[in-house]
Amino acid sequence: MQSLEILAIVALVVAAILAIVVWTIVGIEIRKTLRQKKIDRLIDRIRERAEDSGNESDGDEEELSALVEMGHHAPWDVDDL
């Protein structure tokens, strides 16, 4: 094989690896965004129900706490120290 062919094959392999890494990062960020939207919807629903009456949001609070306990940190829990 000529050196140009070897270089082309190496470039294709590197491009494929970079594409896999980039799309993996994109997928992770999309999942984070979707989970955060779900948490935001639950918080809004809890707020609306808390305004209407006092005790109807218990199920939503349990679902929210389950989401937060799954390893997703709520935006108000910042530990940047």
UniProtKB/Swiss-Prot annotation:
GO terms for cellular component: host cell membrane; membrane. InterPro entries: Vpu, Vpu_cyt_dom_sf. Phosphorylated by host CK2. This phosphorylation is necessary for interaction with human BTRC and degradation of CD4. Residues 29-81 are cytoplasmic. Keywords: AIDS, Apoptosis, Host membrane, Host-virus interaction, Inhibition of host innate immune response by virus, Inhibition of host tetherin by virus, Ion channel, Ion transport, Membrane, Phosphoprotein, Transmembrane, Transmembrane helix, Transport, Viral immunoevasion. The modification Phosphoserine is found at residues 53, 57. Residues 70-81 have a biased composition (Basic and acidic residues). Gene3D superfamilies: HIV-1 VPU cytoplasmic domain (1.10.195.10). Its main location: host cell. The keyword Transmembrane helix applies. Pfam families: Vpu (PF00558). Ion channel activity is inhibited by hexamethylene amiloride in vitro. It is found in: Host membrane. The keyword Cytoplasm does not apply. Residues 1-7 are extracellular. Homopentamer. Interacts with host CD4 and BRTC; these interactions induce proteasomal degradation of CD4. Interacts with host BST2; this interaction leads to the degradation of host BST2. Interacts with host FBXW11. Interacts with host AP1M1; this interaction plays a role in the mistrafficking and subsequent degradation of host BST2. Interacts with host RANBP2; this interaction allows Vpu to down-regulate host BLM sumoylation. Enhances virion budding by targeting host CD4 and Tetherin/BST2 to proteasome degradation. Degradation of CD4 prevents any unwanted premature interactions between viral Env and its host receptor CD4 in the endoplasmic reticulum. Degradation of antiretroviral protein Tetherin/BST2 is important for virion budding, as BST2 tethers new viral particles to the host cell membrane. Mechanistically, Vpu bridges either CD4 or BST2 to BTRC, a substrate recognition subunit of the Skp1/Cullin/F-box protein E3 ubiquitin ligase, induces their ubiquitination and subsequent proteasomal degradation. Belongs to the HIV-1 VPU protein family. HAMAP family: HIV_VPU. This is Protein Vpu. It comes from Human immunodeficiency virus type 1 group M subtype B (isolate RF/HAT3). The gene is vpu.
